[in-house]
């Protein structure tokens, strides 16, 4: 799914990375790559990665100051869908399952007491709820399965408008007509059990999605009156189940107290949190979040100060400064998504696969990566499943699947000419009459991407009409609207909602997901044979089988050159010298408040 900015513009998420929960939440499968998806991507010496940060043994106490340029999007767990939101959501809420912070290969039962149970026909998923977890004030009672049911049901409430309910929970019985109240697809036979009833054998993807914040319990008696407002006001009056809570008044009001929009937020300890029920150590006593300011000033303050982190992508000059002078305070997180060039597969010159291959062959992907900061923060992409996602190695790993139009990262005009001749242009240059419509995003590095793409197409003989617009406009008015017939969108991207290769490939490249507006399949990719294989792969249970099947689909998508991948992102994050930060590899390496401590 598309998780924009703060999951950082214009990268989409379907947005952030888990593993198959149905395998007992284990990290490895037999006879194949690890569930975490080996990448062979490493950071330079002296730089942290989430994988080499220690989650245990931190010092208890102290106050962490967080400096962020960006504002939160949503504090309601039913609405939250960005990296910066997730860091406070997962510190204050307990979904059914949660990620271990510094690896993609293990997901822990959180509100659940054990792994989900998928029936043999894959149409029923059963989860048992952990006892002894209580809501924060003012609710102050024990969580039951009904609270989890209400949390997910409200995802269908138009006043909440959860962005991924239909994608992952749409196969539940009655989900298509649900509007925020009970529906047949969710039942609670007792206070410790919740059962999901599906119309299709999609139990695996439903089980995977139980790591998302929509599954964090919400007390109906507290939230329902707030959910009747349009939009819901629950995000202004929050109840916590995690180790921390937003500072609030006696009525649970957060707005204006623990959260000052555009200014600050304060997380304090949840007095009702029971550490014996949780895998989080929660070392810190308090987290003070300051919002706004120049990213370069923020980054320098963090590097030169104490007790501070920046919990968003560091600005390029700050990354360079940290690399040269504060290297131990720099974290580089792999698996931060993919950037690619969307081309219109349905109409115009790029409906011809050989024209798409010619464009791919001609493109200087190294130059596009340099615009993003080079090898420290990106790798040249050679296919679609990105590092750390299961199936990455089987899909080709770093080198890629070995096709000539992919073999020259700086571009090869001779190979491009070969494919243009195959497409029916004997001179090896495009001689058609159509003017190519290119719509890119303003601001670095997106505008640089667009300009390089524009020049590459001109070098191939295309006439172009080139426009730059704001990122949100690019998606909402042009690249996400098929009727606009945009031929090329130079810098779109994707971040998976969880570490299943389906979450990388299905939505952006499956013809089933082409929509008249808000279309996430920017290139209108519609290959019936590949769509059928996706439908079969979606039903598989067990990550080794799923990784192998989706890796084959990745190779077929490359063979059809449905889009041109150019960058696998690695996110840079910075901390003060006395902070023992632990990054969430599943969430772009952002600092995890429940595991980070002060030295």
Predicted regions: what they are:
Residues 573-599:
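Long beta-strand-rich cores associated with HINT superfamily self-processing modules
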């Amino acid at each position: 799914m598309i998780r924009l900015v703060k999951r950082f513009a214009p990268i989409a998420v379907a947005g952030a990375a888990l593993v198959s929960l149905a395998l007992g939440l284990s990290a490895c499968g037999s006879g194949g790559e690890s569930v975490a998806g080996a990448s062979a991507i490493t950071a330079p010496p002296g730089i942290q990665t989430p994988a080499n940060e220690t989650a245990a043994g931190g010092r208890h106490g102290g106050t962490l100051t967080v400096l962020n340029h960006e504002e939160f999007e949503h504090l309601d767990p039913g609405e939250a869908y960005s990296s910066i939101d997730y860091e406070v959501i997962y510190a204050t809420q307990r979904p059914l399952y949660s990620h271990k912070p510094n690896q993609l290969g293990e997901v822990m039962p959180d509100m659940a007491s054990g792994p989900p149970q998928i029936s043999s026909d894959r149409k029923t998923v059963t989860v048992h709820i952990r006892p002894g977890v209580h809501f924060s004030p003012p609710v102050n009672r024990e969580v039951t399965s009904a609270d989890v049911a209400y949390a997910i049901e409200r995802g269908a409430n138009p006043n909440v408008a959860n962005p991924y309910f239909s994608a992952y929970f749409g196969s539940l019985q009655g989900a298509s007509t649900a509007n925020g109240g009970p529906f047949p697809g969710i039942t609670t036979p007792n206070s410790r059990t919740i059962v999901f009833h599906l119309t299709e054998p999609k139990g695996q993807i439903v089980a995977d999605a139980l790591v998302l914040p929509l599954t964090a319990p919400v007390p109906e008696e507290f939230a329902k009156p707030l959910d009747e407002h349009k939009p819901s006001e629950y995000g202004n009056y929050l109840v916590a189940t995690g180790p921390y809570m937003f500072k609030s008044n006696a009525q649970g009001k957060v707005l204006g107290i623990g959260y000052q929009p555009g200014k600050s937020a304060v997380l304090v300890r949840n007095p009702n949190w029971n550490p014996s029920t949780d895998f989080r150590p929660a070392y810190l006593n308090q987290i003070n979040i300051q919002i706004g300011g120049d990213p370069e000033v923020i980054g320098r303050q963090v590097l030169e100060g104490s007790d501070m982190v920046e919990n968003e992508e560091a600005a390029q000059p700050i990354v360079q400064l940290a690399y040269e002078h504060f290297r131990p305070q720099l974290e580089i997180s792999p698996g931060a998504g993919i950037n690619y060039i969307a081309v219109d597969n349905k109409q115009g010159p790029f409906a011809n696969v050989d024209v798409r291959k010619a464009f791919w062959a001609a493109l200087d992907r190294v130059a596009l990566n340099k615009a993003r900061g080079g090898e420290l923060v990106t790798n040249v992409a050679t296919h679609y499943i990105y590092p750390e996602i299961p199936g990455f190695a089987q899909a080709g790993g770093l080198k890629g699947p070995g096709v000539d139009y992919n073999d020259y990262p700086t571009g090869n005009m001779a190979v491009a000419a070969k494919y243009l001749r195959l497409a029916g242009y004997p001179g090896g240059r495009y001689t058609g009459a159509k003017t190519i419509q290119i719509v890119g995003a303003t601001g670095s590095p997106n505008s640089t991407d667009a300009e390089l793409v524009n020049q590459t197409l001109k070098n191939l003989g295309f006439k172009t009409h080139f426009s730059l617009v704001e990122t949100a406009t690019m998606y909402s008015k042009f690249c996400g609207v098929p009727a606009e017939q945009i031929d090329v969108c130079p810098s779109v991207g994707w971040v998976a909602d969880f570490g299943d290769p389906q979450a990388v490939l299905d939505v952006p490249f499956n013809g089933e997901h082409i929509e008249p507006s808000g279309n996430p399949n920017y290139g209108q990719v519609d290959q019936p044979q590949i769509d059928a294989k996706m439908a079969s792969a979606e039903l598989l249970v067990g990550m080794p089988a799923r990784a192998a099947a989706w890796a084959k689909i990745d190779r077929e998508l490359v063979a059809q050159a449905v889009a041109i991948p150019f960058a696998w992102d690695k996110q840079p994050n910075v901390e003060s010298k006395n902070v023992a930060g632990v990054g969430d590899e599943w969430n772009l390496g952002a600092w995890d408040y429940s595991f980070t401590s002060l030295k």
